[in-house]
């Protein structure tokens, strides 16, 4: 699992990016967020996640808010 910080997340569109120190930003889709109900992330929030290979490159999976 990697740790990072939410760079930005557009709740209306359901996606954003997670910043990982010393690495490229990682795309995150709302469906990858592990929580019940409304799934969203806040800018600056710390998260833990796995990186998987998506259609357009690396993306976050199993995202957990810290």
Curated annotation (Swiss-Prot):
Protein location: Cytoplasm
One Pfam family this sequence matches: CSD
Protein's UniProt keywords contain Cytoplasm: yes
Superkingdom per UniProt: Bacteria
GO cellular component term of the entry, any: cytoplasm
CSD domain: residues covered: 1-66
Molecular function in Gene Ontology: nucleic acid binding
Keyword Acetylation found: no
Keywords from the named record: Cytoplasm
SUPFAM superfamilies: Nucleic acid-binding proteins (SSF50249)
PANTHER family attached to this UniProt entry: COLD SHOCK DOMAIN CONTAINING PROTEINS (PTHR11544)
Known role: Involved in cold stress response.
Protein name: Cold shock protein CspA
Source taxonomy: Bacteria, Bacillati, Bacillota, Bacilli, Bacillales
